[in-house]
């Protein structure tokens, strides 16, 4: 099956691990040649990214934000097992060679930093983590450094597991527990806002428990989409995860209030086990968010306290001017009296929903990373060349006229609907031009939606024997690789949801249906998310669902 069955783990190791894993346990690795770093061959980075060809020295990513490692990461840290992986890199358990302290090292492959946007995201993540004061609720950054092949963020180790997993594992889940979690999340938001930072991607997966103790602190771990802001400043870039996205994000006019909305979505899920705004498609999710109708009728809401429901309503207030601030949320009676909140179990239905939500996310995350991993350098390079050809005056942007002219030149490669989408992008962004990052994002969206090739590749990754079905053992092995634990219980829960014809295995059609139901495309690709939701926003603007106003 060739490259389509290449594990994301293998790809990540090729990009990152080979440049810094110790040759043998506990031993230092000899200094590597400067030009022999990871990704030296192929994978050019467009628009100022961290890429470079064979024999080329890669440009520094961190600059003043980090230190440069001449010999590689293992001069200072011994890296061990993989803890997780994302779009750009892999997180490893590591040990400080001097102090023997166990830490986590997030290694970001420079080869995957394809554009200036990617590089700036990493640089800003480090700057924000350094800017925020130390807090028991935020993972601490010990060091940021880079070598030839990767950027390494060495952080405090959190071994207590994800938020929902801990809740599901407990035999007794109550409003009181939900209130304690909510307080921690909103305290993180308050700290960020006080120090001029919007998180922009609050979701359960971005919170881990520090350890496995019952009283372990909950910590925010990911600031990859966070941004600095000044009072009154508004942003238009669409980022974040669909379920947790505030309506003003879709309207392209937002400020720090979006973090309260996202925290409100998490609270709603904590209390009932499902998102408040859900649909079969991304457009359906977006329209549900814009309608803002909150369901308090289904189980277990009749048994939830009025104070809890009042706080949910106020956090999910569609008008950001009327939405509670972090300070007001923390002063709300439900949180002020958290110790008096009902300690009666919310019921098995909530735990069951949370477990399903968590495990389906894990399966989708795995599949989406396979999709992201197989966006080839050639695909990106083709887009880059098209951009250069259209940018006839070489000013780094494609104007409306250049786009129209370029589309005529490249017309055979673009369907009419795709041409229209690109033109709409220019018409609605207010600049009458596309920079490379915008052009790339929209183009990636067009490529991915043009056919099911990427979904087929992801399916074949799981279908190891090529018989046309993902069988229980194949699914179990893939999820074990992804750190889900060697548990058939997880597999059976996923099968129960995805295997609609109940034949004990997952067909391609069942897999596609799962992937297209409320899928969180942010986990597939940051570029894809930006392109997809910018395109979706344009569509909603065009059909009148979204009104662009100066708020």
From Swiss-Prot:
Recorded GO MF terms: ATP binding; calcium ion binding; calcium-dependent protein serine/threonine kinase activity; calcium/calmodulin-dependent protein kinase activity; calmodulin binding; protein serine kinase activity
Binding-site list for Ca(2+) 1: 391, 393, 395, 402
Binding positions (ATP): 83-91, 106
Keywords of this entry: ATP-binding, Calcium, Kinase, Lipoprotein, Membrane, Metal-binding, Myristate, Nucleotide-binding, Repeat, Serine/threonine-protein kinase, Transferase
Active-site residues, Swiss-Prot/TrEMBL: 201
Tissue expression from the record: Expressed in roots and developing seeds.
Bilayer topology annotation: Lipid-anchor
Chief subcellular location: membrane
Leading EC class: transferase
Gene that this sequence comes from: CPK3
Annotated organism of origin: Oryza sativa subsp. japonica
Protein name per Swiss-Prot or TrEMBL: Calcium-dependent protein kinase 3
């Amino acid at each position: 099956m060739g490259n389509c069955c290449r594990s994301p783990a293998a790809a990540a190791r090729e990009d990152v691990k080979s440049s810094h894993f110790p040759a043998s346990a506990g031993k230092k690795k000899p200094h590597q040649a400067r030009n022999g770093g990871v990704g030296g061959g192929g994978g050019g980075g467009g628009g100022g990214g961290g890429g470079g060809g064979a024999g080329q020295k890669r440009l520094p990513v961190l600059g003043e934000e980090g230190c440069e490692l001449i010999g590689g990461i293992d001069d200072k840290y011994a890296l061990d097992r993989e803890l997780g992986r994302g779009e750009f890199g892999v997180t490893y358990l590591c040990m400080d060679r001097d102090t023997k302290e166990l830490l986590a090292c997030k290694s970001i492959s420079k080869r995957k930093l394809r554009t200036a946007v990617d590089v700036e995201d990493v640089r800003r993540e480090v700057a924000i983590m350094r800017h925020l004061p130390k807090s028991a609720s935020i993972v601490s950054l010990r060091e940021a450094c880079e070598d030839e092949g990767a950027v390494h963020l060495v952080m405090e180790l959190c071994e207590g597991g994800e938020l929902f997993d801990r809740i599901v594992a407990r035999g007794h889940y109550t409003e009181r527990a939900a209130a304690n979690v909510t307080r921690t999340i909103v305290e993180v938001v308050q700290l960020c806002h006080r120090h001029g930072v919007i998180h922009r991607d609050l979701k359960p997966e971005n919170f881990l428990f520090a350890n496995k103790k019952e009283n372990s602190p909950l910590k925010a771990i990911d600031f990859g989409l966070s941004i600095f802001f000044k009072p009154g400043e508004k942003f238009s870039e669409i980022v974040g995860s669909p379920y947790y996205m505030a309506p003003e994000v879709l309207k392209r006019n937002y400020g720090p209030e979006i973090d309260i909305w996202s925290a409100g979505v998490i609270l709603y899920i904590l209390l009932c086990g499902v998102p408040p705004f859900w649909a079969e498609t991304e457009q359906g999710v977006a329209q549900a968010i814009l309608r803002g109708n909150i369901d308090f009728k289904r189980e277990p809401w009749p048994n939830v306290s009025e104070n809890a429901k009042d706080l949910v309503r106020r956090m999910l207030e569609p008008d950001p001017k009327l939405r509670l601030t972090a300070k007001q949320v923390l002063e709300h009676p439900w949180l002020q009296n958290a110790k008096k909140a009902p300690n009666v179990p919310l019921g098995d239905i909530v735990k069951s929903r949370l477990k399903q939500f968590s495990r389906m996310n894990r399966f989708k995350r795995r599949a989406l990373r396979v999709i992201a991993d197989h966006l080839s350098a050639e695909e990106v390079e083709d887009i880059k060349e098209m951009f250069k050809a259209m940018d006839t005056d070489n000013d780094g942007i494609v104007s409306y006229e250049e786009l129209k002219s370029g589309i005529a030149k490249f017309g055979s490669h673009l369907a009419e609907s795709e041409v229209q989408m690109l033109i709409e992008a220019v018409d609605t962004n207010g600049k009458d031009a596309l920079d490379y990052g915008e052009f790339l994002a929209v183009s990636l969206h067009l490529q991915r939606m043009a056919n099911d090739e990427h979904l087929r590749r992801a399916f074949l990754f799981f279908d190891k024997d090529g018989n046309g079905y993902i069988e229980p053992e194949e699914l179990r092995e893939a999820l074990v690789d992804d750190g889900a634990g060697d548990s058939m219980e997880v597999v059976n829960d996923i099968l129960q949801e995805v295997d609609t014809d109940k034949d004990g295995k997952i067909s391609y059609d069942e897999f596609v249906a799962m992937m297209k139901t409320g899928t969180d495309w942010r986990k597939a690709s940051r570029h894809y998310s930006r392109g997809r939701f910018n395109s979706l926003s344009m569509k909603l603007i065009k059909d009148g669902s979204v009104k662009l106003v100066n708020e």
